[in-house]
Amino acid sequence: MTRLRRLLVTDRIFFVTSNLLHGHSPLWDREFDLLIDVFKAVRQQLGFALCGYVFMPDHWHALIWPQFPLTISRVLKEIKEVSTDLLNQQRRVEGNIWQPRFWDRFVRNKKEFNERLEYMHLNPVRKGWVVRPQDWRWSSHNNFSLDPLIVGACPIQVDYIHLSDDYRG
């Protein structure tokens, strides 16, 4: 059985998921902070829009919009390579940390964008890590607060975009 082929598509918003390899110990505070630094650095380097994210102990989700000619595969490759190197240094281990592939889906409209964003932000609540999504430090939830002091304290500032009701990229 062959693995799924990935289309080389750009100029779309993608909902992506990347999982730790089976058997790796979960990520926690210091490692989440490291992932935040990686996302900021890779976004600065490659120039993609980050519209939302959540880091969980065994996986992460993000809404990423790579600008032409950048592809989602290139973005994920860079995030995973840089984070693997830094996490391995911190853990004093070698080898892959992330599963080699990732899951992605085009976001087709504003409704779907908001559903994916809500899914990400409620993930820590569903898993029982916090009672309210705003209490999970490692997500973009607080970027969408109406209080500018809360937004200013967010570890990653997300890119705010305007989508029409019938966005198709």
Where are these regions (language model features)?
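Short catalytic/metal-binding and nucleic-acid-binding patches
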Residues: M1-G169
